[in-house]
Amino acid sequence: MKFTLISSCVALACMALAVEAAPSGKKINVPLSKNANYKPNAKRAIEKANAKYARFRSSSSSSSSSSCGSAGTESSGSVPVTDDGNDIEYYGEVTVGTPGIKLKLDFDTGSSDLWFASTLCTNCGSSQTKYDPSQSSTYAKDGRTWSISYGDGSSASGILGKDTVNLGGLKIKNQIIELAKREASSFSSGPSDGLLGLGFDSITTVSGVQTPMDNLISQGLISNPVFGVYLGKESNGGGGEYIFGGYDSSKFSGDLTTIAVDNSNGWYGITIDGASISGSQVSDSFSAILDTGTTLLILPSNVASSVAQAYNANDNGDGTYNINCDTSELQPLVFTIGGSTFEVPTDSLIFEQDGNTCVAGFGYGQDDFAIFGDVFLKNNYVVFNPQVPQVQIAPISN
């Protein structure tokens, strides 16, 4: 599930993209937008991430790395995503049904369900767009129910159905959808209408459900089983995109580094070989999850403590740290992954500022693995391949 703070958004135009695809291939573009009224809250972001993984608390993920490589494709779709607030969440427009209704959905590699507000919902937010199954000629009943709850007490539940899902021009037929009949206020008061999970199908709420990515592959809508993720920074105007079936080589510099994925827990788990600051190592290897649905960079407590010590950051006792507000006195946080190095630059080390007090973009959670959320991902382009499985990472272009 994608966990974010509540905020509204302002639409932002997206730019044309150079996608790695054959000339006849399609592009699906999902633009990002920013919210000028958003006020970040690092403590709440940590709480949400802890709640997200509470039901998997005993799990951890790890993997070995492999050699460098790149991916091409003959058919692809590009979905622009909206950057809400201070890079707190990213969502894209997805069309569901016939005639289609446009829904704003969180794109989340840390979960695998496709669910959204519906006209059957008794407590969904008044500002949410609600899918009406009675108005779609391609809707079919399923008969099953779904329910999901998180460690912070939030939950959502409803019924399953089938309908056509248009993902940036790629029409998925008979996609299982989860229609919310009830949802917690943390969802109903948010800027999005639901969630599109991009994790592995082993962690869908209802067993045996195929994810949208599964169906893009099985229905032959994409020939290359990958999706490329670019998350723009609010400081640079926001923006971003998901490309299904390919990636955008103009968005990163250098070569893609290929890293093996451990998907035994349903996530994109990788091994981080180490972390350093100013050339000094601050951590040995540890496991991490690449999660577009988490805002911050959440580290195991021992790793976070070492990183904080190097920055003279003070522990607030709630998973967050106060850090020096002067970025000129900070150095990038560098991770070695698959034999290559990837940075979290100094401008991303500060997430929240209130006067002379700054809260860091990194923190610690309740798990023995790290969650590499948007603080890392907005600085590094990632190509996800669920079939191998593997990811490919490169620094974003300046």
Curated annotation (Swiss-Prot):
Kindly state a single biological-process term from the GO annotations of this entry.
Answer: proteolysis
From the UniProt annotation, give the residues forming the signal peptide. 1-21
Reactions this protein catalyses: Hydrolysis of proteins with broad specificity similar to that of pepsin A, preferring hydrophobic residues at P1 and P1'. Clots milk and activates trypsinogen. Does not cleave 4-Gln-|-His-5, but does cleave 10-His-|-Leu-11 and 12-Val-|-Glu-13 in B chain of insulin
- SUPFAM superfamilies in the record: Acid proteases
User: Its family?
Assistant: Belongs to the peptidase A1 family.
Q: Which PANTHER family match?
A: ASPARTYL PROTEINASE, BETA-SITE APP-CLEAVING ENZYME, ISOFORM A-RELATED
Can you name this protein?
Answer: Rhizopuspepsin-4
Q: Which organism is it from?
A: Rhizopus niveus
